[in-house]
UniProtKB/Swiss-Prot annotation:
Binding site for ATP: 42-49, 102-109
Superkingdom of the source species: Bacteria
Native organism: Paracoccus denitrificans (strain Pd 1222)
Protein family: Belongs to the CbbQ/NirQ/NorQ/GpvN family.
ATP-binding found in the keyword field: yes
InterPro entries in UniProt: ATPase_dyneun-rel_AAA, CbbQ/NirQ/NorQ/GpvN, CbbQ_C, P-loop_NTPase
Keyword Acyltransferase (UniProt): no
Record protein name field: Protein NorQ
Gene (UniProt): norQ
Keywords: ATP-binding, Nucleotide-binding
Gene Ontology MF term list: ATP binding; ATP hydrolysis activity
Length: 270
């Protein structure tokens, strides 16, 4: 099966740390209470996946996370017949398991999946809340608690990879972005354990780098990468080397652009 799936148990005690940026928690809770699907839009590494994990734990629901990719098909989500012990046995995919169990199914970067995936989602994202399985003849009604959540990065969309309006309009949608600096400092310090003074410098650098998006860089540095740089620094790595490894090399292969980013870091840290 080509789906890359992560599962998460329930229980608010295990909720991953997430610092709200606005009213996204309230919107998600209201959508969940009304059995509405949710679409999260925002750049890579801004906290969408962490938010979903936090909300699943907060609501006490199991979570199936599927990392979508070019080869992900509807069969990967629904299931297929597999050979086991000399016989052919039907095996549910992550979407089917979530529908049966009343769990949250999160499709990360849904636009990366094959087009047949969106067709499967349509009957789950209207008042029918059903999942037809042609291979078995079943038509599964979603168990109480089932919720479909999908995400994508609008900045990566092109004419071949986009969500049709007919699909987008089936979801409650929320836009995410990188946290404002004071909140990002709090997040990075909490996640990495680095002192706030050095964390503040890394966040300032991240803001400067994000200003280059669309010019020298396809994408700005993510909060995730800032956490990586802070974590490396806290473990004793030289700050310049940590920035190079976590905030420069992952963004570009262009030697000239990398030199410019190093100069930017030097201007901030001296």
């Amino acid at each position: 099966m080509n789906a890359h799936v992560k599962t998460q148990g329930n229980g608010a005690v295990d909720a991953p740390f997430y610092l709200p940026q606005g009213d996204e928690v309230a919107v998600f809770e209201a959508a969940a209470a009304n059995d509405l699907p949710v679409l999260l839009k925002g750049p890579t590494g801004c906290g969408k996946t962490r938010f979903v994990a936090h909300m699943a734990a907060r609501l006490g629901r199991p979570l199936y996370t599927v990392a979508c990719h070019d080869d992900l098909s509807a069969a990967d989500l629904i299931g297929r017949y597999l050979l086991k012990g000399g016989e052919t046995v039907w095996t549910d995919g992550p979407l089917t398991r979530a529908v049966r169990e009343g769990a949250i199914c999160y499709l990360d970067e849904v636009v990366e999946a094959r087009k047949d995936v969106t067709v499967v989602l349509h009957p789950l994202t209207d008042d029918r809340r059903i999942l037809p399985i042609d291979r078995t003849g079943e038509e599964i009604e979603a168990a109480p608690g089932f919720m479909l959540v999908a995400s994508y990065n609008p900045g990566y969309q092109n004419i071949l990879k986009t969500l049709k309006p007919s699909t987008r309009q089936r979801f409650v949608a929320m836009e995410f972005d990188f946290p404002e600096p004071a909140r990002e400092v709090e997040i990075v310090a909490r996640e990495s354990g680095l002192d706030r003074d050095r964390t503040l410098g890394l966040v300032r650098l991240a803001g400067k780098i994000r200003g280059l998006k669309g010019q020298d860089l396809e994408e700005g540095v993510s909060t995730r990468l800032v956490v990586y740089a802070a974590s490396l620094t806290r473990r004793g790595m030289n700050l310049d080397r940590a920035i190079e490894a976590a905030m420069i090399e992952p963004l570009t292969d262009d030697a000239e652009v990398k030199r410019g980013l190093r100069d930017l870091a030097a201007a901030i840290f001296g």
